[in-house]
A protein has these predicted regions:
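Intrinsically disordered, low-complexity polyampholyte segments enriched for Lys and acidic residues
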Residues: 4, 14-16, 21-22
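Phosphate-backbone binding interfaces of nucleic-acid-interacting proteins
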Residues: 22-135
């Protein structure tokens, strides 16, 4: 089952409003199968001081096969170092790296974005092994 309203946490409030109003164009299963979505555990969190909008630099352990990857994420409304460290998250692991405010973002952590631009991260309902693929 594909959830229709999961969006990448780097979207803006304006983009979010447009996204909720209209579903994106359909894709084939072949295209979806190219997206490598994995489960990982947050091992470190710090503020991204260079970012224009409040952001966190999050390091996630995706297990032996993928290793530790980092992401710059605009998730500061609900999350901080204390409540995010140790939490399991779901991320797209095979996007090209992107420099975001001086941080090389290697993965895109997934979350839902409400009408005010506040992000709630997607996470498993129970603890699972790092690196497991999401199908």
């Amino acid at each position: 089952m594909i959830v229709k309203f999961i969006v990448i946490i780097f979207c803006t409030h304006k983009y979010n409003q447009l996204y909720i109003k209209k579903m994106k164009e359909q894709i084939t299963y072949d295209i979806f199968n190219k997206v490598d979505i994995r489960l990982g555990t947050v091992i470190s969190v710090k503020k991204n001081e260079k970012a224009r909008k409040p952001s966190l630099v999050v390091e996630v352990d995706f297990g032996k096969e993928i290793g530790i990857k980092q992401s710059s994420a605009q998730i500061t409304h609900y999350y901080n170092e204390e409540n995010l460290k140790g939490k399991q998250v779901i991320a797209v692991c095979n996007f090209a790296e992107k420099n975001i405010a001086g941080v090389i973002s290697q993965v895109l952590i997934l979350g839902s974005v409400d009408s005010e631009g506040k992000v709630t991260l997607v996470h498993p309902s129970q603890k699972a092994d790092n690196g497991l693929p999401i199908a």
